[in-house]
Amino acid sequence: MKNITDSFVSVGYWSSAGSFGFNTDILATNPINLSVVLGVLIFFGKGVLSDLLDNRKQRILSTIRNSEELRGGAIEQLEKARARLRKVEMEADEFRVNGYSEIERERVNLINATYENLERLEIYKNETIHFEQQRAINQVRQRVFQQALQGALGTLNSCLNSELHLRTISANIGMFGAMKEITD
């Protein structure tokens, strides 16, 4: 029990003496105390610090590996996208060329159809003109014939007497009878 009492007395003695505490004056501190503290820190902190550094190193390496994998995937996707772009560009060029040739073909077909329509219209116009000319000629012939017939009838009526008239009718009937015998 004496030891316990002595320890309390000694704590009281030392605390009242003021020799226990931190000395913040670097030049006044004991180099041995500093080396002991540093040794303890290095001994115990070395494992913690190396674990922290190893963890940090592993995270950095993992991040680098992930970045490399992502970079590889991005490069692969970029190459696929470039290949698709080249394919689409070739298809677009093909469509453009085919489109231009199709447009040119349609233009030529349209021009040919227009020329054919114009030729048909020209033929129709010429036929219509020819028909109208023939109709006009027939109308003129009919009028000339009617006028000639009326003139001839007028001349015959004025020049013919009854006897000449009967003789002409008999001669015409005889001619028609002869024509009928020939055709039968």
Curated annotation (Swiss-Prot):
CDD domains: ATP-synt_Fo_b. Its main location: plastid. The chain crosses the membrane at residues 27-49. It holds the Pfam family ATP-synt_B. It is a single-pass membrane protein. F(1)F(0) ATP synthase produces ATP from ADP in the presence of a proton or sodium gradient. F-type ATPases consist of two structural domains, F(1) containing the extramembraneous catalytic core and F(0) containing the membrane proton channel, linked together by a central stalk and a peripheral stalk. During catalysis, ATP synthesis in the catalytic domain of F(1) is coupled via a rotary mechanism of the central stalk subunits to proton translocation. Component of the F(0) channel, it forms part of the peripheral stalk, linking F(1) to F(0). HAMAP family: ATP_synth_b_bprime. Belongs to the ATPase B chain family. In plastids the F-type ATPase is also known as CF(1)CF(0). This is ATP synthase subunit b, chloroplastic. It comes from Chloranthus spicatus. The gene is atpF.
